[in-house]
C-alpha cells in the first residue's frame, strides 16, 4: 500500500514537472492535430507549443504542406494551451519577482544591475576591443551553472562564437574559482562557431531543439553583429542587412520568451566621422542602428579604465537608472576592481 502511494506521489510530481516550462509541440497531437503536421512544424523549427502560438499565421502557411485552414486550426489549438491574454499588473509583478538573475562575478557590477543579468530578456554589451565583453561572456557561461542561491541559474550554457575568441581554458579558471568540477562545467557548455549570417540564424533553430531536450539558463552570441559587417557591405545592402539582423534578433527574443533563458549578445562600435563627432564627448556608437537598440532590453556600454579595470555604464534599460560601475578582468574571470 505504502509502495503504491509512493508511486502515485512520484507520478504526480512528474505531471507537475511536465506542465511547468515550455511544452513540446507534440502535445498538439492530443488536441486533434495530425502527427504529420506536427512533424512538419518541428522540421520548420517550431519545437514548442509556445513557438507555434507566438508565430504569425503567414509563417505557418509558408511551411510546405500546411494550408491556410490547417494553420488556423493549429493556431486556435495552440492558443488554448498557451496563455496569451490580459493579466493584472499584480500578477505580472508577482511573475517579475520570481525572475532569476545570474551573477557576473563582480559584486559592483551585480549591484549596478540590481542583482545580475536578468533571465528572459536580451542584454547587449558593446564597446571597443579589449573592454571585457568576451571575458564577461566566459564568466557567465560558468556562473549560470551555479545553484540559484549562489547567484546562478542551475542550467547549461549555449555559446555561439562568430569571432573565434572562445577559450575553454578560461572556463576552467572560472570553474576553479567557484569550486566547480572543470569537466562538468565544460560538458554543460554547448559551443558552436558561426561562419556567416545565415549559419548564425540556422544555429538558433538547433538551439531551440536542444532547449526542449535539456535545461539551458544562458544563450551567448559573441558577437551578434561581426558577421553582418562582412557579409553586407556598403549602403546598397544596408536595408537587406537590417532586415536580416531584425529577424535574427526576433528569434533571440522568442527563445528568451519561450524558454526563459538569459540572452547575452555582444556588439561592436563604430567611430562617428561626421561633423557632429567633433562635439561629442565620446565619438563611438554601437553598430546595428535602431534595430538592435529596440531589440535589446538592457544595453551596457563597456570602456577601458586604468590597467586591468574596466567601466560598465547602463546605456539603456526599462528599469535601471543610468549609472556606472568598475570591474576588473582577473586570471579567474571577471571580479571587483582593487582600490
Curated annotation (Swiss-Prot):
It comes from the Eukaryota. Belongs to the RecA family. RAD51 subfamily. GO terms for biological process: cellular response to camptothecin; cellular response to ionizing radiation; chromosome organization involved in meiotic cell cycle; DNA damage response; DNA recombinase assembly; DNA strand invasion; double-strand break repair via homologous recombination; interstrand cross-link repair. Forms linear homooligomers, giving rise to a RAD51 nucleoprotein filament, which is essential for strand-pairing reactions during DNA recombination. Interacts with BRCA1 and either directly or indirectly with p53. Interacts with XRCC3, RAD54L and RAD54B. Interacts with the BCDX2 subcomplex RAD51C:RAD51B. Component of the homologous recombination repair (HR) complex composed of ERCC5/XPG, BRCA2, PALB2, DSS1 and RAD51. Interacts directly with PALB2 which may serve as a scaffold for a HR complex containing PALB2, BRCA2, RAD51C, RAD51 and XRCC3. Interacts with RAD51AP1 and RAD51AP2. It is found in: Nucleus; Cytoplasm; Cytoplasm, Perinuclear region; Mitochondrion matrix. A motif (Nuclear export signal) lies at residues 245-260. ATP binds at residues 127-134. There is a cross-link at residues 58, 64 (Glycyl lysine isopeptide (Lys-Gly) (interchain with G-Cter in ubiquitin)). The modification Phosphothreonine is found at residues 13, 309. This is DNA repair protein RAD51 homolog 1. The modification Phosphoserine is found at residue 14. Residues 184-257 are annotated as: Interaction with PALB2. GO terms for molecular function: ATP binding; ATP hydrolysis activity; ATP-dependent DNA damage sensor activity; DNA strand exchange activity; double-stranded DNA binding; single-stranded DNA binding; single-stranded DNA helicase activity. GO terms for cellular component: centrosome; chromosome; condensed nuclear chromosome; cytoplasm; mitochondrial matrix; nuclear chromosome; nucleus; perinuclear region of cytoplasm. Plays an important role in homologous strand exchange, a key step in DNA repair through homologous recombination (HR). Binds to single-stranded DNA in an ATP-dependent manner to form nucleoprotein filaments which are essential for the homology search and strand exchange. Catalyzes the recognition of homology and strand exchange between homologous DNA partners to form a joint molecule between a processed DNA break and the repair template. Recruited to resolve stalled replication forks during replication stress. It comes from Oryctolagus cuniculus (Rabbit). The modification Phosphotyrosine is found at residue 54. Ubiquitinated by the SCF(FBH1) E3 ubiquitin ligase complex, regulating RAD51 subcellular location and preventing its association with DNA. Ubiquitinated by RFWD3 in response to DNA damage: ubiquitination leads to degradation by the proteasome, promoting homologous recombination. NCBIfam families: PRK04301.1, recomb_RAD51. The modification N-acetylalanine is found at residue 2. The lineage of its organism: Eukaryota, Metazoa, Chordata, Craniata, Vertebrata. Residues 1-24 are annotated as: Disordered. InterPro entries: AAA+_ATPase, DNA_recomb/repair_Rad51, DNA_recomb/repair_Rad51_C, DNA_recomb/repair_RecA-like, DNA_repair_Rad51/TF_NusA_a-hlx, P-loop_NTPase, RecA_ATP-bd, RecA_monomer-monomer_interface. Keywords: Acetylation, ATP-binding, Chromosome, Cytoplasm, Cytoskeleton, DNA damage, DNA recombination, DNA repair, DNA-binding, Isopeptide bond, Mitochondrion, Nucleotide-binding, Nucleus, Phosphoprotein, Ubl conjugation. Residues 48-77 form the HhH domain.
Amino acid at each position: 500500500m505504502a509502495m503504491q502511494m509512493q508511486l502515485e506521489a512520484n507520478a504526480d510530481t512528474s505531471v507537475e514537472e511536465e506542465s511547468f516550462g515550455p511544452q513540446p509541440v507534440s502535445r498538439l497531437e492530443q488536441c486533434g492535430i495530425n502527427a504529420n503536421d506536427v512533424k512538419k512544424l518541428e522540421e520548420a523549427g517550431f519545437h514548442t507549443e509556445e513557438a507555434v502560438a507566438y508565430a504569425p499565421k503567414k509563417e505557418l502557411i509558408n511551411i510546405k504542406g500546411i494550408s491556410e485552414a490547417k494553420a488556423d486550426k493549429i493556431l486556435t489549438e495552440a492558443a488554448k494551451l498557451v496563455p496569451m491574454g490580459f493579466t493584472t499588473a499584480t500578477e505580472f509583478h508577482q511573475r517579475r519577482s520570481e525572475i532569476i538573475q545570474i551573477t557576473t562575478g563582480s559584486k559592483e557590477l551585480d549591484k549596478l544591475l540590481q542583482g545580475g543579468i536578468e533571465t528572459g530578456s536580451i542584454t547587449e554589451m558593446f564597446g571597443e576591443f579589449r573592454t571585457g565583453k568576451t571575458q564577461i561572456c566566459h564568466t557567465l557561461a560558468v556562473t549560470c551553472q551555479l545553484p540559484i542561491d549562489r547567484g546562478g541559474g542551475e542550467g547549461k550554457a549555449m555559446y555561439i562564437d562568430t569571432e573565434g575568441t572562445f577559450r575553454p581554458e578560461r572556463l576552467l579558471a572560472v570553474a576553479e574559482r567557484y569550486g566547480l568540477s572543470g569537466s562538468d562545467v565544460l560538458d554543460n557548455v554547448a559551443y558552436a562557431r558561426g561562419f556567416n549570417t545565415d549559419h548564425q540564424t540556422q544555429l538558433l533553430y538547433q538551439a531551440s531543439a536542444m532547449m526542449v531536450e535539456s535545461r539551458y539558463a544562458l544563450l551567448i552570441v559573441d558577437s551578434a553583429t561581426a558577421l553582418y559587417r562582412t557579409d553586407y557591405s556598403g549602403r546598397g545592402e544596408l536595408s537587406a542587412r537590417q532586415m536580416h539582423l531584425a529577424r535574427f534578433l526576433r528569434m533571440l527574443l522568442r527563445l528568451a520568451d519561450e524558454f526563459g533563458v538569459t540572452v547575452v549578445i555582444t556588439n561592436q562600435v563604430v567611430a562617428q566621422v561626421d561633423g557632429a563627432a567633433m562635439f561629442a564627448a565620446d565619438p563611438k556608437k554601437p553598430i546595428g542602428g535602431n534595430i538592435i537598440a529596440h531589440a535589446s532590453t538592457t544595453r551596457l556600454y563597456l570602456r577601458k579604465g586604468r590597467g586591468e579595470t574596466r567601466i560598465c555604464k547602463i546605456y539603456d534599460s526599462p528599469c535601471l537608472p543610468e549609472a556606472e560601475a568598475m570591474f576588473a578582468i582577473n586570471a579567474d574571470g571577471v571580479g571587483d576592481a582593487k582600490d
